[in-house]
Regions:
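Short alpha-helical segment that forms part of, or immediately flanks, the ligand-binding pocket
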Residues: 59-62, 86-95, 105-109
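Short acidic/histidine- and often glycine-rich active-site loop of Leloir-type glycosyltransferases
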Residues: 83, 104-114, 118-119
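A conserved mid-protein helix/loop that constitutes part of the nucleotide-sugar donor-binding site
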Residues: 3-17, 35, 126
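Nucleotide-activated donor-binding/catalytic signature segment of Leloir-type glycosyltransferases, i.e.
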Residues: 22-29, 34-63
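A short, well-ordered alpha-helix in the C-terminal region of glycosyltransferases
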Residues: 127, 134, 141-155, 162-168
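Conserved acidic donor-binding segment of nucleotide-sugar-dependent glycosyltransferases
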Residues: 113-114, 118-125, 132-140
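Short hydrophobic beta-strand element within catalytic cores of glycosyltransferases
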Residues: 70-73, 91-102
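Short acidic alpha-helix that forms the nucleotide-activated donor recognition element
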Residues: 16, 36, 56-68, 94, ...
Length: 181
């Protein structure tokens, strides 16, 4: 979603700085910020930035994510998103790609703890550029981050495992309640 919850200016500013490199950026989606992003692309003549607002199926989304070298999560100042875990991060991990997460909250901490990518300070374009260049020059690190993310999903976040944990939690509360009364 191209909404204020995400800092797309961070990506635009990185694309401006890296426009003479072979690094390409893709922003895919729809939302309130689509026109702003398109205007910035035109204003700065960003040939290295593709904006695609066409609808795609879930299968196509998976393919697009798998074809990407690195996946970005530029969190904005939304407390709700910064202190929750957007499913987008789990999708990124599921396809086994490294993540660069601009977050001062739980999202960045999660990426760091699962060793599935790099956490940078929110809004810090220089850290984003440095992280992009670091991953570009280190395919082995990209693979390690991607593998770690995928393993995290397989070990902890399948429907089966979540269902079992939820069942145990429900049993715990049922027993707790029966002991109270």
């Amino acid at each position: 979603s191209l909404v204020e919850s995400y800092d797309f200016d961070l990506i635009i500013n990185a694309a401006k700085t890296l426009k003479d490199k072979k690094i390409k950026f893709l922003i895919k989606g729809r939302g309130k910020l689509l026109q702003h992003i398109k205007q910035q692309k035109e204003k700065y003549h960003l040939e290295n930035l593709t904006i695609d607002s066409t609808f795609v199926s879930n299968e196509q989304i998976v393919k697009i994510l798998q074809e990407s070298d690195v996946l970005l999560s530029p969190m904005g100042n939304s407390k709700v998103l910064n202190y929750s875990l957007p499913t987008k991060i789990l999708e990124y991990q599921a396809v086994g790609r490294p993540i660069i997460c601009a977050s001062d909250g739980a999202v960045g901490e999660y990426v760091e703890e699962t060793k599935s990518g790099l956490k940078i300070k929110q809004g810090d374009v220089y850290s984003l550029i440095e992280s992009i260049l670091k991953l570009e020059s280190n395919p082995e690190l990209c693979k390690t981050f991607g593998d770690n993310g995928r393993k995290n999903i397989e070990d902890k976040n399948t429907f089966d495992k979540i269902g079992k944990e939820l069942s145990l939690l429900i049993l715990y509360f049922v027993k707790l309640e029966s002991n109270i009364w």
